[in-house]
């Protein structure tokens, strides 16, 4: 005989959990039943009507259906335990335990109902489900998923759409659901909540229509040092940046945050737009070069310089960082522009060697860098940091230099050396005939 008590279980759309595919009727655990732990494999989970809305979304498990659950209590092999959500030491076996969540080795599944349907929500509430459990989780879940019928019904029976720090409003902004935002505004939601959280987050996520609606409703674009436009630029949302500029945002706010972060993240079109706006205002943005160099974006470096940034900014900081981080293309570009590669006592070579950037080391030496600078710093630190390819290369160059230094002061050896060079050149030329 089965229990007359009705329990409930929420399943995902595939009705699978821990590898088990749920079906109508009896479901039997194929593996060993787990007597201990919480939210672990080794059992079928279910709850009573009152607590069912606790599990709409649980531990990353997104609910789609709710199933009626009955228990085969007359089966001698049936096992049921209370799952100890908070008290990990409490675990007892029983036939009809108190509590809000249980685990069994066998369950019988009845009707399957879609959670997105208003009739399903009404049915569960009639069965005893608490519609405001967990800080009005049900209405927050309905807002997040755009279930307007369910929202209206819940508001009619007293649910609080602003509960849990306006979570419903926040999730709407995050998802970019413009229709839901319009609905919430009609219902009296405060768009200025939490220092204009809404427009800042909408700009961050690039939700153009949401930002536009909030602007039309009077959101403060200047909040927290022009944070909306700074976040839009930082995340590459070109259209949102243009929109906010049209509403009067200060694009240079917070020490040129917008162009520096857009440059760092490689958003070419945003950088170009902001650079032009800053030029119109006579505002320099040389420091954006540093941001671009940190991530090695040559295209952004070129764009900034072509639009007025000074590549010699802060004692050629871009060149020094490019050497330090191994950005060979930027190093070459800086040299073409006229950078003295020996600046600051051959800083570029010293740090390229220290960090193991062989291509940069080779390029710098080819163009006149001094491997002996600062008491053979490059050689010492290449060895110290186990960059043996760089160390070997530098030692070979050092040996060649020592040979040249030696023969330079010996006339006989110098003459012999030049004869060897001339003879080698003749042989090569003869072979090429």
UniProtKB/Swiss-Prot annotation:
Pfam families: Ank (PF00023), Ank_2 (PF12796)
InterPro entries per UniProt: Ankyrin_rpt (IPR002110), Ankyrin_rpt-contain_sf (IPR036770), Multifunctional_ANK_Repeat (IPR051165)
Sorted UniProt keywords: ANK repeat, Repeat
Keyword Repeat carried by entry: yes
Domain of life: Viruses
SUPFAM superfamilies recorded: Ankyrin repeat
The ANK repeat ranges on this chain: 104-133, 134-163, 165-193, 194-223, 224-253, 254-283, 284-313, 315-343, 344-373
PROSITE patterns: ANK_REP_REGION, ANK_REPEAT
Annotated protein name in UniProt: Putative ankyrin repeat protein R267
Organism expressing this protein natively: Acanthamoeba polyphaga mimivirus
Lineage, opening ranks: Viruses, Varidnaviria, Bamfordvirae, Nucleocytoviricota, Megaviricetes
